[in-house]
Amino acid sequence: MSHSVKIYDTCIGCTQCVRACPTDVLEMIPWDGCKAKQIASAPRTEDCVGCKRCESACPTDFLSVRVYLWHETTRSMGIAY
């Protein structure tokens, strides 16, 4: 079951989440919106196992990367059974 991975613009480009991900869901891409000139991206969300290690590794106060587990996503959209 696939999970949603959202990267917010509070990302500082530190690569901590990319290094923490055991299934290589995340990667860094060029971005001019921060000092590091890069931001995390989640091109392989189908491989996300929902461990949330990326969230734990994020050093920003705003949790720049968030994993929404399948049941959390459907519940927030009002379509849970």
Swiss-Prot record:
Cofactor detail note: Binds 2 [4Fe-4S] clusters. Cluster 2 is most probably the spectroscopically characterized electron acceptor FA and cluster 1 is most probably FB.
Compartment(s) where it occurs, according to its Swiss-Prot or TrEMBL record: Plastid, Chloroplast thylakoid membrane
Pfam families given in the database record: Fer4_21 (PF14697)
Q: GO: which molecular function terms?
A: 4 iron, 4 sulfur cluster binding; electron transfer activity; metal ion binding; oxidoreductase activity
Query: A single GO CC term, please?
Result: chloroplast thylakoid membrane
Residues annotated for [4Fe-4S] cluster 1 binding in this entry: 11, 14, 17, 58
Q: What Enzyme Commission number(s) does the record list for this chain?
A: 1.97.1.12
User: Which keywords annotate this record?
Assistant: 4Fe-4S, Chloroplast, Electron transport, Iron, Iron-sulfur, Membrane, Metal-binding, Oxidoreductase, Photosynthesis, Photosystem I, Plastid, Repeat, Thylakoid, Transport
- Superkingdom of origin organism: Eukaryota
Q: Does the keyword Iron-sulfur apply?
A: yes
Which segments constitute the 4Fe-4S ferredoxin-type domain?
Answer: 2-31, 39-68
Binding site residues for [4Fe-4S] cluster 2: 21, 48, 51, 54
Q: How does it sit in the membrane?
A: Peripheral membrane protein
Any Gene Ontology biological process: photosynthetic electron transport in photosystem I
Q: Which PANTHER family match?
A: PHOTOSYSTEM I IRON-SULFUR CENTER, PHOTOSYSTEM I IRON-SULFUR CENTER-RELATED
Output the HAMAP family linked to this UniProt entry.
PSI_PsaC
Partners and quaternary state?
The eukaryotic PSI reaction center is composed of at least 11 subunits.
Protein name in the entry: Photosystem I iron-sulfur center
Annotated source species: Helianthus annuus (Common sunflower)
